[in-house]
């Protein structure tokens, strides 16, 4: 990007189980209606992005990006805030940070670390596929 195109919105603070915040289509329409030009996507929220699919499929990402653009916003970045924090957790914070991890790796610091690293790597691939 050579120039700033306008305000973008971090969707993690709005994503939820009720419309319009519970699906990619409706939340991107809502963001555009609010005047935003872009949306930062939380890569951990499956209601908005299937990270495994995005990491492995350019077609998935083309559809994902295309739907956002049809609704009036761009996807300037994916967020890995939660997973990234889990890549280097001091043992004193194990319990506090465990809630950021997938349920199947909670309580197991080495499994949580492996999961977090894998999530960040998948987000890199997904970001490349989105373009």
Question: Would you name each region that the model predicts?
Answer:
Residues 1-129:
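N-terminal pre-domain/capping segments
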């Amino acid at each position: 990007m050579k120039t700033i195109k306008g305000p973008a919105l971090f969707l993690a603070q709005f994503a939820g189980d009720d419309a319009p915040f519970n699906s990619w289509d409706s939340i991107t329409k809502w963001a555009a209606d609010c005047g935003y030009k872009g949306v930062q996507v939380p890569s951990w929220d499956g209601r908005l992005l299937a990270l495994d699919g995005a990491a492995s499929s350019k077609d998935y990402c083309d559809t994902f990006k295309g739907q956002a653009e049809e609704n009036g916003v761009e996807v300037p970045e994916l967020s890995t805030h939660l997973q990234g924090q889990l890549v280097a957790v001091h043992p004193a914070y194990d319990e506090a940070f465990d809630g950021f991890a997938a349920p199947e790796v909670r309580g197991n610091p080495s499994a949580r670390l492996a999961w977090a690293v894998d999530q960040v790597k998948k987000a890199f691939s997904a970001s490349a596929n989105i373009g």
